[in-house]
C-alpha cells in the first residue's frame, strides 16, 4: 500500500472545503497530529480494520467485532486533541448496533457517528438515530 504523503493532504485541503480522513487504529497519534498540522480537522475513526490474509491480500474487518478496537482508539485520539485544546471532529464508526454503542462512542469523545451495517437490521435504526439526536441536543 502506498504511503500518504504531505503533498497529497495539502492538495485535498486546498481543493476541497470539507476533507474527512478515514483512519484505522493502526495509524499512530503522531501521524494524526501531522495530518492536523496540514489542515485536516475531521477524522473518521474507523469503520474498517485493515487485515492481510495468508496470501498477502488485503481486506477489512467491519461490524460488531470492531467496537472493542475502535472505542479505545477514539478515546486516545479525542484525549490527544483535548489535552492540546484543539477542536477536531471525530466520526466514530464500527459496531454501532444499539443506543449504548452510540453512548459509548460519545463518552469516548466522538462528535459524529458513521452507520452502515445496522441498516441490514432496519428495525434497530430508529433507536440509534434517536440517541444521536438526543446527544446532539445536549
Give the location of each predicted region.
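Conserved beta-alpha-beta core of the PfkB/ribokinase-like small-molecule kinase fold
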Residues: 1-30
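Glycine/Thr-rich beta-alpha phosphate-binding loop at enzyme active sites
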Residues: 1-5, 30-88, 125-128
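Glycine- and other small-residue-rich loops at beta-strand/loop junctions that grip anionic moieties
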Residues: 2, 21-24, 62-66, 91-95, ...
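Short, flexible coil/linker elements and helix-boundary hinge sites characteristic
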Residues: 8, 17, 82-85, 137
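Short, aromatic/basic amphipathic alpha-helical patches
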Residues: 11-12, 34-35, 131
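Catalytic cores of alpha/beta
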Residues: 26-39, 79-84, 90-113
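Glycine-rich phosphate-binding active-site loops on the catalytic face of alpha/beta enzymes
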Residues: 42-51, 96, 102-129
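Extended, intrinsically disordered, low-complexity segments
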Residues: 130-138
